[in-house]
Amino acid sequence: EVSITIFDENGEVVVGETPEPEVTPEPTVDPSLPVYEADGSILLTMTFAGDMTIGSNVQSSGTSIFEKELEKQKGDINFPFRNVRDILLADDLTMVNFEGTLTTEGRNPDKTGNEFLFRADPSYVDMLPAGGVDTVSLENNHVLDMGDSGLEETKKTLLAAGIPYASEGEPAILTVKGVKIGSLAYQTFGGRHDELIAKVPGDIQALRDQGCDIVIVSYHWGAEKDYYPNDNQVRLGRATVDAGADLVV
């Protein structure tokens, strides 16, 4: 079959089909290249959020509130962040504390008596970049809800989705607008404040040695329903700043 299109002297189609307009692809931005402001500086807008949980509490029977809402939204992966996604997509870096798991593994046998054990289907990971989340911390009291194998699947799932994670001993390193950013994450359960005061400076220096321009240190700390940091948090936070951290969150 031969398709013939005839144009008049003005370039209008007189016979045949109007050709599809050419689509100019959006230019891709290389994150390793610096983006300068008019004054020669580099401006980075970062957003940090606290505990973020998707999926279900497997200790509860029946369909979870999250699953019911997802069904109501006809599987729309944008619904968890719909009220803030415009903000998170517009910034340069969004980091959250991912408090849960992305796994098909069963309960951690050491935590069967816990009231809350969080698990999300690995496919739900797509909700994070859809909502503007760029990187996560995995230091909290729910990452082991489905045991060591559940945590490992969570890590692999995040990386496969292009989301770097920070966990103790596993810093996340990202480059944004040519700025190399290192992220460290810790939890303080069991009164580890003095241990971390001794440990964290070396971890910060290790990221500096790798060429990080900015070092972010994230702690999962404090007590529920407390509105102010306790003395141990203040000591650890101050020691972290003194050790060279640019941001403590």
Residue locations for each model-derived region?
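Short linear proline/tyrosine/threonine-rich motifs used for host-factor recruitment
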Residues: 13-15
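Acidic, metal/ion-coordinating pockets
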Residues: 4-11, 20-249
